[in-house]
């Protein structure tokens, strides 16, 4: 996993309010980060944070009530040896959860070794879940793509195409028909799971849509709160093409896909021409995609009916010759 620039300080700043973290020792270790080799070999955020585990000392160590009770039961020599081994390998930081008080000798050792030590009243399980989700998000593959990203009938749809084809105008018409804007011009996509890509708007462009001749429109102010969305999963790409595009297929026999962060996203191409109602065509494409996700493929059904009709015709012709 890629965790360049992620330090104890940045993790604390991003999560202190959510899980009520307090920094009690090791302030000099603010720049401490994950071991580079360990982070590279980690396959998921579950490898990066967990309950106290001396077998995996390089990860974030969370100590709840059971771990603190175990620690306090150890004799002085064993406690000193085990914590010495843990601190020596420089974990990013330690968290004392469940509202437990940090043992004085552990706090002193963290201070001397500049190992950040946090405390929180939140349960250890909740701390681990929160930090795993946080690390998954910041380390996930991401890309910024050009287009208009909309919520159409509950489906995340990215409208793409060359400059000047009317993507923003089409987006504005779809918004006026009751659909929602996620982002215009630049869309930040992040892959959060094996089949899950989430799209968001960069903070600078939040709620804004740029239309030639009108300038920047604040969609939230003009159309209301329900006209904008914070995020959506991308399920469909609509590619606008010029009428003279030689690669356009009127009736594509094979499904078309666009690779987004290694995940194939279903794509449809729509020709832009005078008199065509693009908003209706996009809505129809979305409805058709919903049917495809339910296992209903209209084109395949038509081809099957056509094939059956041709076979029946061939059989009747053969019988006619025999007569």
Swiss-Prot record:
Known Gene3D superfamilies for this protein? HprK N-terminal domain-like, P-loop containing nucleotide triphosphate hydrolases
Where along the chain is Mg(2+) bound? 168, 210
Matching entries from SUPFAM superfamilies are given as:
HprK N-terminal domain-like, PEP carboxykinase-like
- Binding-site list for ATP: 161-168
Q: Does the keyword Magnesium apply?
A: yes
Instruction: Check the record and name the InterPro entries matching this protein.
Output: HPr(Ser)_kin/Pase, Hpr_kin/Pase_C, Hpr_kin/Pase_Hpr_N, P-loop_NTPase, Ser_kin/Pase_Hpr-like_N_sf
**Active site, per annotation:** 146, 167, 185, 250
> Which E.C. number(s) belong to this protein?
2.7.11.-, 2.7.4.-
Domain of life from the UniProt record: Bacteria
Keywords attached to this entry: ATP-binding, Kinase, Magnesium, Metal-binding, Multifunctional enzyme, Nucleotide-binding, Serine/threonine-protein kinase, Transferase
**GO BP annotation list:** regulation of carbohydrate metabolic process
- What enzyme class is recorded for this protein? transferase
Instruction: Write down the chemical reaction(s) this protein catalyses.
Output: [HPr protein]-L-serine + ATP = [HPr protein]-O-phospho-L-serine + ADP + H(+); [HPr protein]-O-phospho-L-serine + phosphate + H(+) = [HPr protein]-L-serine + diphosphate
Q: Where is this region: Important for the catalytic mechanism of both phosphorylation and dephosphorylation?
A: 209-218
Names of required cofactors:
Mg(2+)
Entry GO MF terms: ATP binding; magnesium ion binding; phosphorelay sensor kinase activity; protein serine/threonine kinase activity; protein serine/threonine/tyrosine kinase activity
Q: State the family it belongs to.
A: Belongs to the HPrK/P family.
Question: What does the function comment of this entry state?
Answer: Catalyzes the ATP- as well as the pyrophosphate-dependent phosphorylation of a specific serine residue in HPr, a phosphocarrier protein of the phosphoenolpyruvate-dependent sugar phosphotransferase system (PTS). HprK/P also catalyzes the pyrophosphate-producing, inorganic phosphate-dependent dephosphorylation (phosphorolysis) of seryl-phosphorylated HPr (P-Ser-HPr).
- Other comments on record: Both phosphorylation and phosphorolysis are carried out by the same active site and suggest a common mechanism for both reactions.
Complex and partners: Homohexamer.
Q: Read off the PANTHER family from this record.
A: HPR KINASE_PHOSPHORYLASE (PTHR30305:SF1), PROTEIN YJDM-RELATED (PTHR30305)
**UniProt domain comment:** The Walker A ATP-binding motif also binds Pi and PPi.
Q: What is this protein called?
A: HPr kinase/phosphorylase
Q: Which organism is it from?
A: Cupriavidus necator (strain ATCC 17699 / DSM 428 / KCTC 22496 / NCIMB 10442 / H16 / Stanier 337) (Ralstonia eutropha)
Gene name linked to the record: hprK
């Amino acid at each position: 996993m890629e965790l360049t620039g992620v330090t104890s300080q940045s993790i604390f700043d991003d999560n202190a309010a959510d899980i009520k973290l307090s920094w009690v020792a090791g302030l000099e270790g603010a720049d401490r980060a994950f071991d580079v080799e360990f982070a590279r070999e980690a396959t998921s955020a579950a490898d990066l944070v967990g309950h106290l585990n001396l077998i995996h000392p390089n990860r974030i160590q969370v100590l709840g009530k059971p771990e603190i009770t175990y620690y306090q039961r150890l004799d002085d020599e064993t406690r000193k040896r085990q914590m010495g081994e843990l601190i020596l390998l420089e974990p990013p930081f330690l968290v004392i959860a469940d509202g437990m008080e940090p043992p004085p000798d552990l706090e002193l050792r963290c201070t001397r070794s500049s190992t950040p030590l946090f405390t929180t009243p939140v349960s250890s399980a909740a701390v681990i879940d929160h930090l795993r989700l946080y690390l998954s998000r910041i380390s996930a593959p991401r890309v910024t793509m050009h287009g208009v990203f909309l919520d159409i009938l509950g489906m995340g749809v990215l409208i793409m195409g060359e400059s000047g084809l009317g993507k923003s105008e089409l987006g504005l018409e779809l918004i006026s028909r009751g659909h929602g804007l996620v982002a215009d011009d630049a869309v930040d996509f992040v892959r959060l799971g094996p089949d899950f890509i989430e799209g968001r708007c960069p903070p600078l462009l939040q709620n804004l849509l740029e239309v030639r001749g009108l300038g920047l429109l604040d969609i939230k102010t003009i159309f209301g709160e329900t006209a904008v969305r914070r995020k959506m999963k991308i399920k469909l790409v609509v590619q606008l093409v010029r009428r003279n595009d030689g690669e356009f297929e009127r009736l594509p026999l094979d499904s078309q896909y666009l690779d987004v962060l290694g995940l194939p996203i279903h794509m449809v191409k729509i020709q832009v021409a005078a008199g065509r109602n693009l908003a209706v065509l996009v809505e129809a494409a979305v409805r058709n995609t919903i049917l495809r996700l339910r296992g209903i493929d209209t084109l395949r059904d038509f081809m099957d009916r056509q094939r059956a009709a041709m076979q029946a015709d061939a059989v009747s012709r053969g019988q006619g010759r025999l007569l």
